[in-house]
């Protein structure tokens, strides 16, 4: 027995001697000095006291974990061996007798409850069947006497009929007894069933036995297949029931295809589509491979492709639009208030050579207040003019780009269209296009017959040509006013403005100035010093500096607003064009502008629109383009160039069809998938999108719906007015070559040092040639602060009052610009030439 002193024990347990002596006295030991000896029994007594003091239970462990490890060697080819180590772990838990008894009692209670429920259900089922038999027996007993009186053996059957009523009392025990008996002999019920279904003779001779066998299966099967079997499975499968009986009424695979409702948004991935159809993603990928399109499970599909896949696989498709955010935005923009009259918004349209720009310049010079040098800054595309009868807002939209964009988005930014027609030139294809734009938008027309001061002017011919296209003059009984004007002399301009204001009174244009501002973008640009600048036309409400605006997929707070004269303004009412600064990007022409209450909402909608546009653009990245078709012309298989062709007249369409179908050889061919007479419509654009075709327009133009699809889907659309150009371009496409590009080479740059007047040419710019050489009769651009404000032709070039064909760098010269008088000191005149350069793949 090991004996140690108190001091040594204190050192072992790392406790001060005084503290250890105190604990020993508390344990009932008689030690008082550090040199006294401590025996093992005294150590055990001290340990027991310390454990009881910390409330630690002194008991044996209830759970024991045993780990077993075995190592073996596995021989493989090449005289190599691999060592394999297998580890096993077993856990033994010791339960107290009380816990074991409680567990056993709980299982007994659960089993007894299940058996009672099964017995009660069997009794109810037997009682129900007995009642049904009792109701059916009187009918049989009434028909039996007529046929059974001569036969004495039938009497027991008639006596048994009334006795069927008290059967429910004894039906349940007999059913339980049969059930227990049949569980011990599982093969007998099948034999009895076969005998019961054996033949007609046995059923005729023993009808009472047949009725018993009809009632027997119900109580025998029902209790066992529901509660008792499920209870036996919960007990770990130790029940006496057969497992195969559980599958008697189990799941069976459907015999026919399951048709599901598939909701498809504007974009959907292959995995999401397969999940909605309850098929494996591999099936969808295999189907796409058969269609010739390899995809992955995470690839984004557009709405049309996903709809085709789901319908081909036999499912119902519901097309949904992810516009919940847009709908909530539209609800928040509704405003009710008092409406007042507003100024009309007028767009001037027509052929570029018919005097549209000259008419606008005259109206601007005549109606803008004096003191504003040069009138209105030319890069602003919208301005308003004050007249005696009210204000008129003009939209200067070259090429009608903003007008078609507005129509594509359903906006009614333009109220009246002034159609300019040259009296000496007549109706041109672009004039017809302008009429179609106005009719499609539901905008009234005012026809301005320009150049009436020329000798060849014929007003009746203009009326006759326009009446063919549905524009009838008021003099001829129609509703379209015709005004004869001369933009050069100023004749009839006041009458034209009078007619425009009269049309505005008929339209009864209204607006609510107290509402939040709402408008449309006329144009936008990126200014070097001010950032994104957008020219917007306020359509309704009032736009104020500091408002949070949402413009298409861009947003921002208005930091500054400028009117058409470049002066800062604090607010702008209906029909007033202004420039706004503060957006996070340059919006597209035609985008709608709305004033929102908070920045969070504006940012959320803008990001939603950007993501939506990005997804749709990625999904449609493989749309048919002419360049993509040209790049693949060198492949071995025969290629087909699909074309949708629209012409102005039937004769041109037939000639083009014959010429294009005759092109091609063994490797390439042309196929005209669609065509017709008239402008390019939305259905034509959809046909080109579905067939990966190119849109060709011969003397026709696309309407707003078609241009919207072309812009969104990235389709290739080309306009022609010479039949040989179409044939030549298609030949180049079929031979793997592209048409030529027009490249501009800058020849020289001159800076305006002084401006003086000439009675013959108007404003003459005294310039110093800074770079290159300035040539006469070459196209030029006028730049103000490095921004193009005019493009025209150099009409006069002189040096020391002598005409010069060219002036080199470092020399001074006088330059006269054709049809342009707004030259200022500091402007730069850029002379360039256009060179055709062949494109290469």
From Swiss-Prot:
One of its GO terms (cellular component) is cytosol. Residues 450-453 are annotated as: G4. This is Translation initiation factor IF-2. Residues 486-488 are annotated as: G5. Residues 341-510 form the tr-type G domain. Residues 136-175 have a biased composition (Low complexity). Residues 87-254 are annotated as: Disordered. One of the essential components for the initiation of protein synthesis. Protects formylmethionyl-tRNA from spontaneous hydrolysis and promotes its binding to the 30S ribosomal subunits. Also involved in the hydrolysis of GTP during the formation of the 70S ribosomal complex. Pfam families: EF-G_D2, GTP_EFTU, IF-2, IF2_assoc, IF2_N. It comes from Pseudomonas syringae pv. syringae (strain B728a).
């Amino acid at each position: 027995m090991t004996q140690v002193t108190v001091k040594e024990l204190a050192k072992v347990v790392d406790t001060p001697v005084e503290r250890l002596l105190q604990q020993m006295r508390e344990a009932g030991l008689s030690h008082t000095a550090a040199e006294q000896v401590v025996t093992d029994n005294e150590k055990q007594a001290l340990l027991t006291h310390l454990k009881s003091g910390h409330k630690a239970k002194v008991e044996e462990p209830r759970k024991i974990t045993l780990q077993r490890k075995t190592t073996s060697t596995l021989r493989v080819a090449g005289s190599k061996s691999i060592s394999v180590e297998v580890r096993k772990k077993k856990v033994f838990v010791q339960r107290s007798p009380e816990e074991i008894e409680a567990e056993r009692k709980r299982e007994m209670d659960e089993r007894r409850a299940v058996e009672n429920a099964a017995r009660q259900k069997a009794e109810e089922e037997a009682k129900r069947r007995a009642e049904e038999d009792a109701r059916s027996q009187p009918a049989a007993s009434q028909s039996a006497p007529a046929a059974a009186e001569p036969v004495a053996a039938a009497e027991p059957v008639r006596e048994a009929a009334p006795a069927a009523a008290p059967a429910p009392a004894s039906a349940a025990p007999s059913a339980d007894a049969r059930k227990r008996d049949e569980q011990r002999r599982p093969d007998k019920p099948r034999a009895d069933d076969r005998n019961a279904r054996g033949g007609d003779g046995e059923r005729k001779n023993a009808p009472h036995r047949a009725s018993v066998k009809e009632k027997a299966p119900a109580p025998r099967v029902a209790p066992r297949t529901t509660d008792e079997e499920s209870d036996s499975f919960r007990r770990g499968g130790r029940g006496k029931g057969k497992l195969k009986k559980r599958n008697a009424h189990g799941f069976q695979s459907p015999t026919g295809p399951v048709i599901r409702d598939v909701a498809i948004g504007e974009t959907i991935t292959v995995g999401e589509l397969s999940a909605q159809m309850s098929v494996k993603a591999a099936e969808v990928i295999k189907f796409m491979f058969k269609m010739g399109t390899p995809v992955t499970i995470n690839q984004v599909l557009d709405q049309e492709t996903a709809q085709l896949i789901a319908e081909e696989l036999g499912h119902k498709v519901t097309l949904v639009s992810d516009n919940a955010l847009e709908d909530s935005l539209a609800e928040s923009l509704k405003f009710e208030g008092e409406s007042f009259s507003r100024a009309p918004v007028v767009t001037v349209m027509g052929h570029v050579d018919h005097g549209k720009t000259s008419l606008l310049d005259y109206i601007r010079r005549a109606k803008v207040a004096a003191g504003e040098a040069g009138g209105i800054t030319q890069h602003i595309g919208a301005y308003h003019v004050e007249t005696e009868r009210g204000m008129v807002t003009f939209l200067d939209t070259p090429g009608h780009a903003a007008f078609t964009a507005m129509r594509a988005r359903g906006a009614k930014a333009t109220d009246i269209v002034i159609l300019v027609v040259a009296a000496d030139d007549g109706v041109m294809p672009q004039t017809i296009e302008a009429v179609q734009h106005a009719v499609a938008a539901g905008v009234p027309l005012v026809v301005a017959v320009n150049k009436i001061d020329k000798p060849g002017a014929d007003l009746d011919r203009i009326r006759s040509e326009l009446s063919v296209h549905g524009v009838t003059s008021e003099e001829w009984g129609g509703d379209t006013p015709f005004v004869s004007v001369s933009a050069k002399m100023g004749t009839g301009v006041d009458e034209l403005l009078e007619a425009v204001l009269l049309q505005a009174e008929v339209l009864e244009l209204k607006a609510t100035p107290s509402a939040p501002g709402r408008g449309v973008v006329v144009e936008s640009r990126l200014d070097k010093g001010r950032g994104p600048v957008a020219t917007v036309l306020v359509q309704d409400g009032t736009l104020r500096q500091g408002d949070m605006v949402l413009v298409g997929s861009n947003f921002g707070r208005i930091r500054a607003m400028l009117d058409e004269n470049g002066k800062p303004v604090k607010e702008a009412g209906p029909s007033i064009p202004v420039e706004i600064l503060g957006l996070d990007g340059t919006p597209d022409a035609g985008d709608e502008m709305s004033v929102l209450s908070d920045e969070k909402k504006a940012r959320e909608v803008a990001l939603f629109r950007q993501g939506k546009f990005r997804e749709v653009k990625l999904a449609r990245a493989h749309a048919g383009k002419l360049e993509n078709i040209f790049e693949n012309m060198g492949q071995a298989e025969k290629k087909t160039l699909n074309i949708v062709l629209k012409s102005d007249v039937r004769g041109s369409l037939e000639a083009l069809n014959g010429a294009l179908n005759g092109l091609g050889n063994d490797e390439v061919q042309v196929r005209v998938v669609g065509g017709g007479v008239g402008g390019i419509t939305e259905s034509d654009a959809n046909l080109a999108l579905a067939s990966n075709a190119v849109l060709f327009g011969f003397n026709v133009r696309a309407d707003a719906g078609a241009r919207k699809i072309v812009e969104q889907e990235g389709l290739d659309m080309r306009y022609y007015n010479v039949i040989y150009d179409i044939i030549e371009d298609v030949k180049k496409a079929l031979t793997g070559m592209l048409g030529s590009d027009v490249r501009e080479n800058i020849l020289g740059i001159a800076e305006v040092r002084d401006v003086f007047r000439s009675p013959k040419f108007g404003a003459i710019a005294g310039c110093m040639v800074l770079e290159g050489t300035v040539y006469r009769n070459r196209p030029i651009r006028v730049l103000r602060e490095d921004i193009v404000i005019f493009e025209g032709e150099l009409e006069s070039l002189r040096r020391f009052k002598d005409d010069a064909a060219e002036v080199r760098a470092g020399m001074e010269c006088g330059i006269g610009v054709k049809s342009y008088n707004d030259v200022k000191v500091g402007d730069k005149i850029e002379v360039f030439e256009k060179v055709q350069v062949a494109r290469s793949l």
